[in-house]
Amino acid sequence: MSDEFDAVVGKVRARASPTDDERAQLQRVADAVMADAEAAIADLPVEAEVVQVGSTARGTWTAGDRDVDVFVCFPPSIDREALEEYGLAVGHDVLPDGREEYAEHPYVVGEREGYAVDLVPCYAVENATEIQSAVDRTPFHTRYLQERLDDNSAAEVRVAKQFLKGIGVYGSDLRTRGFSGYLTELLVLEFGGFRAFLEAVADWHPPVRLDPDDHGSETFDDPLVVIDPTDPERNVAAVLSETNVATLQHYARDLLAEPRVSLFTEDDPCPFEAADVEAAVSQRGTTPVALRFAAPDVVDDQLWPQLRKSLDGLCSELDRRGFEVLRSAAFVEDDSGKPETLDTESRGRDVVLLLEFAVAEQPAVERHEGPPVHVREHASGFFQKYDDNSEVAGPFIDGDRYVVERQRAFTTATGFLSSAAVYDVGLGQRIESALENGYEVLVGTDIAALADGFGVDLASYFDPKP
């Protein structure tokens, strides 16, 4: 089995390694971007250092990647407003057709000769514990890994990244909530190679804590904790979801048991057509309800947390009302979970919140229990509240409690989701505003209309894989 595993990894290693021409071309573009940034800095009233960061700087990028990350490091003495002003000035000078995006502060993204370029301002702090913004850590990450990676370990990292991409858990964006490049590199170094990493993962019992430099003292409530060797108060795996940890464990065991190249290849399911959706809904015998609306004008890393919060709020309230949610999901049009292309933004896209009900309809009345009769003050209040209410049955005593049977506000999940009551469930702020602008409710086989635009999402939903 070892020979078979090594043969598979050898093929992937060769495929994932950029050619000499790829390396030279990317570095030529990176050098040109950095030179232009240095020229733009010369016109500013402050000095700054330009550094290349990320996987392309560390030699751990995989063949076909076309991303260049350049940071402009300003003195910590300037204030945040000046950092943003100077950073955007350099960004727009270097990338005149670029656009601004926002994380903790704005930066410029654009394109140079077919390469996606991020030009990000940060503070040139002495060490990562003195950071003033989250991105200030990045140059420290690059230096830390450059000192520890050699050609062989970099190749092992590329294999690991290709595997994580193949099983759909690579990327620290808030849609994926997977493994970042930096986290992947630390894990491969920690265990000494790709196979050793998989063997360790296969036996993990989360929560798992790793501390590469043995200097962390903070406690984190995450399934995987990897103490940042440049900042002992940070968990590098903080974004990583419990589901993605479990997914990695599943496929680590799978690959070790049956080595094959196919696990290293991203494979979106064949999109469902409308007829496929109708057949799936009919076969399951459930009641799916979809809310479709225009996405708010925010970047995906702001959109996805709000979608999850909104789904959680809706599911909790519907469960409380007796409507059993079997499963739920959020879809964003033109978003397959891969990093956004340069022309992909939230504006102009549709969003779907899908809730599938095992129980979608309830009788007209519901049971409402009061306190035990022996809890005199509360029991008396409950009795008096309903005693003269002709719209309820009771109060009567069942066991030791007062009980009434009262009319339900909503007898169907669809009725609730079509009403103003949805705004009382703790929706994400921007999702609430988007719904207030109007939304469409699709029920049962009518959700087949979503196949045009969400076919891959629906295929993944109705035919789920680990």
Swiss-Prot record:
CTP binds at residues 55, 58, 141, 161, 170. Keywords: ATP-binding, Magnesium, Metal-binding, Nucleotide-binding, Nucleotidyltransferase, RNA repair, RNA-binding, Transferase, tRNA processing. It comes from Haloarcula marismortui (strain ATCC 43049 / DSM 3752 / JCM 8966 / VKM B-1809). The gene is cca. NCBIfam families: cca_archaeal. A single active site specifically recognizes both ATP and CTP and is responsible for their addition. It comes from the Archaea. The keyword Nucleotide-binding applies. This is CCA-adding enzyme. Catalyzes the addition and repair of the essential 3'-terminal CCA sequence in tRNAs without using a nucleic acid template. Adds these three nucleotides in the order of C, C, and A to the tRNA nucleotide-73, using CTP and ATP as substrates and producing inorganic pyrophosphate. tRNA 3'-terminal CCA addition is required both for tRNA processing and repair. Also involved in tRNA surveillance by mediating tandem CCA addition to generate a CCACCA at the 3' terminus of unstable tRNAs. While stable tRNAs receive only 3'-terminal CCA, unstable tRNAs are marked with CCACCA and rapidly degraded. InterPro entries: CAA_C, CCA-adding_arc, CCA_tRNA_nucleotrans_2, NT_2-5OAS_ClassI-CCAase, NT_sf, NuclTrfase_I-like_C, Polymerase_NTP_transf_dom, tRNA_NucTransf2. It catalyses: a tRNA precursor + 2 CTP + ATP = a tRNA with a 3' CCA end + 3 diphosphate; a tRNA with a 3' CCA end + 2 CTP + ATP = a tRNA with a 3' CCACCA end + 3 diphosphate. Signal peptide: none annotated. GO terms for biological process: RNA repair; tRNA 3'-terminal CCA addition. Belongs to the tRNA nucleotidyltransferase/poly(A) polymerase family. Archaeal CCA-adding enzyme subfamily. Mg(2+) binds at residues 67, 69, 118. Its cofactor is Mg(2+). The keyword Electron transport does not apply. One of its GO terms (molecular function) is ATP binding. ATP binds at residues 55, 58, 141, 161, 170. Its EC number is 2.7.7.72. Homodimer. Disulfide bonds: none annotated.
